[in-house]
């Protein structure tokens, strides 16, 4: 399972003109399930993402996670958006192959599971809409962007 996380000062996702999720300072996470992923990959990815230290401490060092981004226990927002294109195979030709991505059914199930677990673990979780054409706007703070991946079993 893959997450492209971006430290943002604000982010919003809209579908057909209506806002489905919006946060202030926090993380925008573009999330993709790969073929062979299970709930175990979702759990590991979420744990890593919530504890990944990308926010600055009092000394200006990237040392704080989204769950404690102000250094006093204050959590930032988390905007989770599905994006199957993160699993694209771009190694040959000029057109990406999406064979490595999970099927739409598995992707929907694992995205739903990921969001459910995120909401159980974090106070401010907003989302996009799985499978919809979305417009995502953000102000990347830094910019700070990281690619996190927990590979499917047997596929390092």
Swiss-Prot record:
A motif (Gly-cisPro motif, important for rejection of L-amino acids) lies at residues 142-143. An aminoacyl-tRNA editing enzyme that deacylates mischarged D-aminoacyl-tRNAs. Also deacylates mischarged glycyl-tRNA(Ala), protecting cells against glycine mischarging by AlaRS. Acts via tRNA-based rather than protein-based catalysis; rejects L-amino acids rather than detecting D-amino acids in the active site. By recycling D-aminoacyl-tRNA to D-amino acids and free tRNA molecules, this enzyme counteracts the toxicity associated with the formation of D-aminoacyl-tRNA entities in vivo and helps enforce protein L-homochirality. It catalyses: glycyl-tRNA(Ala) + H2O = tRNA(Ala) + glycine + H(+); a D-aminoacyl-tRNA + H2O = a tRNA + a D-alpha-amino acid + H(+). Its EC number is 3.1.1.96. GO terms for biological process: D-amino acid catabolic process. A Gly-cisPro motif from one monomer fits into the active site of the other monomer to allow specific chiral rejection of L-amino acids. It is found in: Cytoplasm. It comes from the Bacteria. GO terms for cellular component: cytoplasm. Keywords: Cytoplasm, Hydrolase, RNA-binding, tRNA-binding. One of its GO terms (molecular function) is tRNA binding. It is an enzyme of class 3 (hydrolase). This is D-aminoacyl-tRNA deacylase. Belongs to the DTD family. CDD domains: Dtyr_deacylase. InterPro entries: Daa-tRNA_deacyls_DTD, DTD-like_sf. Homodimer.
């Amino acid at each position: 399972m893959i997450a492209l996380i971006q430290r943002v000062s604000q982010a919003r996702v809209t579908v057909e003109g209506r806002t489905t999720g919006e946060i202030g300072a926090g993380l925008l996470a573009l999330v993709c399930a790969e073929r062979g992923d299970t709930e175990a990959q979702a759990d590991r990815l979420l744990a890593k993402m919530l504890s990944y230290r990308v926010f600055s401490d009092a000394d200006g060092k990237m040392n704080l996670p989204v769950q404690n981004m102000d250094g006093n226990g204050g959590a930032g927002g988390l905007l989770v958006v599905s994006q199957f294109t993160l699993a694209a195979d771009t190694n040959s030709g000029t057109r990406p192959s999406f064979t490595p991505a999970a099927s739409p059914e598995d992707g929907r199930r694992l995205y739903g599971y990921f969001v459910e677990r995120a909401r159980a673990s974090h106070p401010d979780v907003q989302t996009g809409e799985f499978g919809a054409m979305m417009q995502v706007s953000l102000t990347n703070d830094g910019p700070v962007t990281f690619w996190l991946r927990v590979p499917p079993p047997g596929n390092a």
